[in-house]
Amino acid sequence: MARKYFVAANWKCNGTLESIKSLTNSFNNLDFDPSKLDVVVFPVSVHYDHTRKLLQSKFSTGIQNVSKFGNGSYTGEVSAEIAKDLNIEYVIIGHFERRKYFHETDEDVREKLQASLKNNLKAVVCFGESLEQREQNKTIEVITKQVKAFVDLIDNFDNVILAYEPLWAIGTGKTATPEQAQLVHKEIRKIVKDTCGEKQANQIRILYGGSVNTENCSSLIQQEDIDGFLVGNASLKESFVDIIKSAM
C-alpha cells in the first residue's frame, strides 16, 4: 500500500529567535502538498510557540520529549496533558540521546507513549542498535526487543511513526547504505506484522534517522520500506528543503 511520506526536523538543543526566523523563512518558500507529505519541525520546547507562529500551516510542529508522568510535582517536565492543552500535535519519544544522556529505558518509552496516546498526541518513537551490537550481529535482536516494548499500545497506526536510528550513524557523518537501511526497515515491518497484523504493518510509517543529508536522501527514500526521515543536524540548514524535496 502507498504510505504518506514523513520528514521530521529535529533541531535538538539549537536555535535562536533570529536563526529560527531565517530558517523558517527558507522552509516556507518550499511549495508542497501537505495532503501527500507530512513535514514536522521539532524545535526546543521554549521555542515552540515562536516556531509555530513563523511556519506556514502546511508544516506541522512538535516537541522533542514528553514526560511519562502526568501533571504534578515533576520539576522541569512537560506532561502529555500540558502538550495537549497547548495544541501540540507531535512528540518525539525514545531518541538515542535521551536514552544515552538521560538513561531512558524501554519501559520509559512505553510509559511516555502510553501517556501521549491517552492525550491524543502523535508520536515519533525511536530505537536502534549500537556499533558494538551491530558488529556482534545483534541488530535484529536488539530492535525486536525495543519495538515489542511498546508496539502493542498502538491502536491508530497513522498516529505513531517509527524511527530507526542506527546509533553508530547519529552525528558521526557515517550512514547505513540504502541496502543496509532497507534490510533493517523490512525486519521492523515484519516485527509489527508478527505482533499486530499485516494490515497494521503495511500501514505504519518507518523513518530512517542516521546522518541523513542532501547527498544520501534520494537513494534512501527509494527503498521500499523507508517512508521518510528523522533529520538532525542537516535540518538546521536551509538545504533541508532539498531533503524534503526528495520525498515529494
From Swiss-Prot:
Catalytic activity: D-glyceraldehyde 3-phosphate = dihydroxyacetone phosphate
Record EC number: 5.3.1.1
Enzyme class: isomerase
Effect of F96A: 2-fold decrease in substrate affinity
SUPFAM superfamilies, alphabetized: Triosephosphate isomerase (TIM)
Effect of F96H: 6.7-fold decrease in substrate affinity
Active site, renumbered: H95, E165
Gene Ontology CC annotation, any one: cytosol
Listed GO biological process terms: gluconeogenesis; glyceraldehyde-3-phosphate biosynthetic process; glycerol catabolic process; glycolytic process
GO molecular function: identical protein binding; triose-phosphate isomerase activity
Keyword Isomerase: yes
Stored HAMAP family: TIM_B
UniProt-recorded name of the protein: Triosephosphate isomerase
Gene: TPI
